[in-house]
A protein has these predicted regions:
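Small/polar-rich, solvent-exposed N-terminal microdomains that initiate assembly or binding
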Residues: 1-63
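Compositionally biased, intrinsically disordered low-complexity segments enriched in polar/Pro/Gly
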Residues: 1-3, 44, 71, 133-139
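Amphipathic alpha-helical segments
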Residues: 5-18, 91-105
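Short beta-strand/turn micro-motifs at beta-sheet edges
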Residues: 63-69
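Oligomerization/assembly interface segments of phage tail-like spikes and tubes
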Residues: 71-84, 121-132
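Acidic-leaning, charged glycine-interspersed low-complexity segments
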Residues: 93-139
Length: 139
């Protein structure tokens, strides 16, 4: 079984700008990324740029049918980019959008482009959708 959210994650860390802005070396000397699923862990250093991948409409759904069988799967993701620098947030968001386009996701209306005074962070949240190729339903 394939995992689309992990595929998105792996493609994001393949992007040089995203890798540069979100990577860090953990206590064990291993490279990690400030790219998280669903929510931000309390232990994450939020003074540095980070990304959250969320499925804003719930789990994937069947997109096309034939003979009562799903032929394609639809994925909806919201990708939040947050940092304390507005231009860094914009640079990462642009890199995310380019990466999502490369893997077949289209951008949807909605999202967020705002500064939150409580957290002192700029947030750019964009929504994306993709239908898998016909017969690619092993998710």
């Amino acid at each position: 079984m394939k995992d689309m959210m992990m595929e998105v994650y792996n493609r994001l860390i393949d992007n040089p700008l995203i890798r540069e802005k979100t990577s860090f070396i953990n206590d064990n000397g291993k490279t990690e990324y400030r790219i998280k699923f669903y929510e931000v862990p309390e232990t994450l250093n939020t003074t540095k740029p980070f990304i959250v991948i969320d499925n804003f409409l719930g789990p994937q759904t069947n997109a096309y049918f034939a003979n009562n069988k799903a032929l394609s799967i639809r994925f909806n993701y919201q990708i939040n980019v947050e940092s304390m620098d507005r231009m860094v947030t914009k640079q990462i968001s642009k890199a995310v959008e380019e990466t999502m386009k490369q893997i077949g996701f289209g951008r949807l209306d909605g999202g967020l482009d705002q500064y939150f005074n409580e957290t002192k962070r700029f947030v750019d949240a964009r929504r994306y959708r993709k239908n898998t190729q016909i017969h690619d339903t092993d998710y």
